[in-house]
C-alpha cells in the first residue's frame, strides 16, 4: 500500500515537471518566432508572438523587452514604455537592464522629456559603465 502511494506521488511529480518544461518550451518558441518576425520587420506578427510568450510566462523580462522594442517600431511609444518599465522591475542582469534603460531614454528623448531621458541614460550607464 505504502509503495503504491509512493508511486502515485512520483508519477504526479513527473507530470508536473513535464508540464513546466512544456510551458518553457512554448515560451521559448514564441520568443524565437517573434525574433524572426522582428528581424524581418513584420512587427505586428512579432507583437502577437511576444504577447503569446507573456501569456505562457507573465514574468518574462525577455518577452517584455522584445515586446517593447516591437511596439516602439510601430510608434506605440506609451505601450513600449510600459513594457520596458515592467521589464526593468523584473530583470536582474545588469547588461540587459542597461539596454532597457537606454531604450527608455530613447523614448523619453523622442517625446522631448529630456530630464527623464537623462535619468534613464544615467541608469543605463550605472548598469553598464
What kind of region is each of these model predictions?
Residues 58, 92-95, 129:
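Short coil turns that delineate tetratricopeptide repeat
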Residues 63, 97-100:
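TPR alpha-solenoid repeat register
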Amino acid at each position: 500500500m505504502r509503495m503504491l502511494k509512493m508511486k502515485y506521488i512520483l508519477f504526479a511529480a513527473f507530470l508536473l515537471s513535464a508540464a513546466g518544461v512544456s510551458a518553457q518550451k512554448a515560451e521559448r518558441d514564441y520568443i524565437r518566432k517573434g525574433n524572426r518576425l522582428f528581424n524581418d520587420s513584420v512587427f505586428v506578427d512579432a507583437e502577437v508572438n511576444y504577447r503569446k510568450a507573456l501569456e505562457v510566462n507573465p514574468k518574462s523580462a525577455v518577452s517584455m523587452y522584445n515586446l517593447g522594442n516591437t511596439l516602439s517600431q510601430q510608434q506605440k511609444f506609451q505601450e513600449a514604455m510600459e513594457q520596458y518599465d515592467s521589464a526593468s522591475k523584473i530583470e536582474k542582469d545588469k547588461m540587459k537592464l542597461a539596454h532597457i534603460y537606454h531604450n527608455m531614454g530613447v523614448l523619453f528623448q523622442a517625446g522631448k522629456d529630456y530630464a527623464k531621458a537623462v535619468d534613464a541614460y544615467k541608469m543605463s550607464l550605472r548598469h553598464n559603465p
